[in-house]
Swiss-Prot record:
<comment type="function">
    <text>Catalyzes the alpha,gamma-elimination of L-methionine to produce methanethiol, 2-oxobutanoate and ammonia; methanethiol (methyl mercaptan) is considered to be one of the main causes of the oral malodor associated with periodontitis and may also play a role in the pathogenicity of T.denticola. Also displays homocysteine desulfhydrase activity, degrading homocysteine to produce hydrogen sulfide, 2-oxobutanoate and ammonia.</text>
</comment>
<feature type="modified residue" description="N6-(pyridoxal phosphate)lysine">
    <location>
        <position position="213"/>
    </location>
</feature>
<protein>
    <recommendedName>
        <fullName>L-methionine gamma-lyase</fullName>
        <ecNumber>4.4.1.11</ecNumber>
        <ecNumber>4.4.1.2</ecNumber>
    </recommendedName>
</protein>
<feature type="binding site">
    <location>
        <begin position="59"/>
        <end position="61"/>
    </location>
    <ligand>
        <name>pyridoxal 5'-phosphate</name>
    </ligand>
</feature>
<feature type="binding site" description="in other chain">
    <location>
        <begin position="210"/>
        <end position="212"/>
    </location>
    <ligand>
        <name>pyridoxal 5'-phosphate</name>
    </ligand>
</feature>
<feature type="binding site" description="in other chain">
    <location>
        <begin position="89"/>
        <end position="90"/>
    </location>
    <ligand>
        <name>pyridoxal 5'-phosphate</name>
    </ligand>
</feature>
<comment type="subunit">
    <text>Homotetramer; dimer of active dimers.</text>
</comment>
<dbReference type="Pfam" id="PF01053">
    <property type="entry name" value="Cys_Met_Meta_PP"/>
</dbReference>
<dbReference type="InterPro" id="IPR015422">
    <property type="entry name" value="PyrdxlP-dep_Trfase_small"/>
</dbReference>
<feature type="binding site">
    <location>
        <position position="377"/>
    </location>
    <ligand>
        <name>substrate</name>
    </ligand>
</feature>
<dbReference type="InterPro" id="IPR015424">
    <property type="entry name" value="PyrdxlP-dep_Trfase"/>
</dbReference>
<comment type="similarity">
    <text>Belongs to the trans-sulfuration enzymes family. L-methionine gamma-lyase subfamily.</text>
</comment>
<dbReference type="InterPro" id="IPR000277">
    <property type="entry name" value="Cys/Met-Metab_PyrdxlP-dep_enz"/>
</dbReference>
<feature type="binding site">
    <location>
        <position position="114"/>
    </location>
    <ligand>
        <name>substrate</name>
    </ligand>
</feature>
<dbReference type="GO" id="GO:0019346">
    <property type="term" value="P:transsulfuration"/>
</dbReference>
<keyword id="KW-0663">Pyridoxal phosphate</keyword>
<dbReference type="GO" id="GO:0047982">
    <property type="term" value="F:homocysteine desulfhydrase activity"/>
</dbReference>
Amino acid sequence: MNRKELEKLGFASKQIHAGSIKNKYGALATPIYQTSTFAFDSAEQGGRRFALEEEGYIYTRLGNPTTTVVEEKLACLENGEACMSASSGIGAVTSCIWSIVNAGDHIVAGKTLYGCTFAFLNHGLSRFGVDVTFVDTRDPENVKKALKPNTKIVYLETPANPNMYLCDIAAVSKIAHAHNPECKVIVDNTYMTPYLQRPLDLGADVVLHSATKYLNGHGDVIAGFVVGKKEFIDQVRFVGVKDMTGSTLGPFEAYLIGRGMKTLDIRMEKHCANAQKVAEFLEKHPAVESIAFPGLKSFPQYELAKKQMKLCGAMIAFTVKGGLEAGKTLINSVKFATIAVSLGDAETLIQHPASMTHSPYTPEERAASDIAEGLVRLSVGLEDAEDIIADLKQALDKLVK
């Protein structure tokens, strides 16, 4: 099916059929083209492909039929023109940003971000003369005030990792483009997936994913994606990846992600249903000081969540009374949940940001980003919700005895 035909289909049909390729053997599953290079018919053909005058494969760092399948699938689901894969989520982030900025440029970013993204923006880019201003993106006016004549990127996570702050994508995109139509609004959509939120439809220019998480969904792949206009994705592919990061997704990993994405919608429905039940339990437990989950009416940005998200996801941030030591006690007391970083797996994962994912932050940076010492991040899995709740209850009860 061509792209126009696919666009008429529902989400579930797209996630199964988008990107599918026919092969001469009639294999139903996507073939794994485990090759580093591709043969040319002639020197002239090789020249045309390197000059981008002819479509076709050259070298797997630049593209591979198996990775093309999953790239086209995600582009279709995000309503983007094109997609570029990378060997990790941070590989997608760096390949994307390096293809845009030069020394002397400026970026506005949310003050609360995934730890490695923050480290790259705050510590890495400064070594190369790129200035980054971090703001609380819950209020679009903060973004507006931070914009400069040399601002090339507005970088957002919504919900933000780990404290679940939301950003009004449509409002920020309008502000950024009014300031400079060439300014790229980049949204990390890892927490939501295209099933729950589509930033391009809301005015953003670029969408990023760590496909390690929900897109793959089974905890056995490291991968990332960049989605946007074809012209920009070509720039990421032939500048950001080819010449700068070399962050290339292997064909076997691409195959696994494509397989995982065929069940994305039903997995996300279950994740979200479980998370709602778990959040409602946590909100009432006496050991919990505060909880951030967009599906709770007590969540400060509940109305924004309803406006730009289909469902509220499966990530929960909650702070336990007693600070750092209480957080450690809770983590060390769970028996059913798995203590691990990452998210979006079938298993429920629990972790302590201050000592794990956000260790690249200094204590002062964590405080400035509203990451409390007792904050716990929970990735609600696909198990029975009652079993997840029972485990959390026995662990939390130890904090109030």
